[in-house]
């Protein structure tokens, strides 16, 4: 059996996309159980599902009514495939509507629910095995089921929802009116695991080790003896892609690392030493710092900064790529979330596909995106499985424009140096305190504000540095990290004593929303 054939034998649970903001969380939670899961369009046909051969199907939630014009439907032959189905929120209403039950708009049914609610189990169910008879769940629905289809029976209700959970054990169809994928549903993970393992019979055969074997085989089959180009940023995603490609095709890979002069302290050298030295990647380092800083001189508007950096990065990359001969493929660190966030027919675009969108139209490469089925935490797990050290795998997220958006106002060498040095101190002290895995993201910002201070016997008028540290689960929302006061005090003392032109430290205690993580 070839490594590629293993991919076809891996058990899969597919999630049909009906537009819920939580869709990717469903797939992510299922993967945590060692079961491969991915989103598919709600327009998928029964024949297409037969080709995929999943062990289970989840119908996601969504913002629409089953009675609305253009409401998202389902190929009803899917109900005849003999595959277990779990309908979540809109998915439960769709099952009910298509199989002969009744769904009413909230105004008529009187059962609108938003927020946490107490679910009461009225009968035993394999879906709820090991969970308490009463449990908190997250409800978010306008319409409501008022009559369940023939062959189904009631499993659970809530004060405002007479049919909060239902099942047809003969067909292995299950419907729940709440969202088990979010953490506000206290036993949601147990419910999803019961569906995957106890009902669908998942054996948990999805792991990073078999992903590596399959992806290497896939890369070798796709590339053959041709050459691949990778734009290396030093971040986690492109670094993991580089190491994976190196293992797959060796010296057929060439990496271009554009140093725009906006990196963190010693970051350029660390990239070269680690990826070029330890892992043997063939890296062309381009020192374009003067080129970028000259273009940014006098620019204060953050959007102009971003556009200048983005455009110039493409020009520099294109210049270097044009010097290479016989390259057929461009590799990118596109993640599954990038593809989802690019927008689907069921959801608005959150952001454009940043990896592809900025490339010149005349760059005629075939794309290789080895990580495009993985979430961020899975990329870190992949890096660890590839033998990459923690300092690379757990590197702090870093924006494409680099320190340019952590310097408020005009960018100068002096301001950049204050951020580089203060950020290095912050990262060092967070690590020393053992908090580097607990805090989602942390960095410093030169606020562009000067204030009066006293150092020694002299008056100073220097920059104010802000510390930003957040906790989060998925990055969509965030709270400021409540760092211990002694740690903050040490960080502040070190920065004002060790970093020139800084005399004041402030701590950003704003959540997201209303603030964003980055200041610009």
Curated annotation (Swiss-Prot):
This is GMP synthase [glutamine-hydrolyzing]. GO terms for molecular function: ATP binding; GMP synthase activity. It comes from the Bacteria. Pfam families: GATase, GMP_synt_C, NAD_synthase. GO terms for cellular component: cytosol. It catalyses: XMP + L-glutamine + ATP + H2O = GMP + L-glutamate + AMP + diphosphate + 2 H(+). Its EC number is 6.3.5.2. Keywords: ATP-binding, Glutamine amidotransferase, GMP biosynthesis, Ligase, Nucleotide-binding, Purine biosynthesis. The gene is guaA. InterPro entries: Class_I_gatase-like, GATASE, GMP_synth_C, GMP_synth_GATase, GMP_synthase, GMPS_ATP_PPase_dom, NAD/GMP_synthase, Rossmann-like_a/b/a_fold. ATP binds at residues 233-239. The keyword Oxidoreductase does not apply. Residues 206-395 form the GMPS ATP-PPase domain. The active site is at 89 (nucleophile), 179, 181. Catalyzes the synthesis of GMP from XMP. Pathway: Purine metabolism; GMP biosynthesis; GMP from XMP (L-Gln route): step 1/1. Homodimer. Residues 12-205 form the Glutamine amidotransferase type-1 domain.
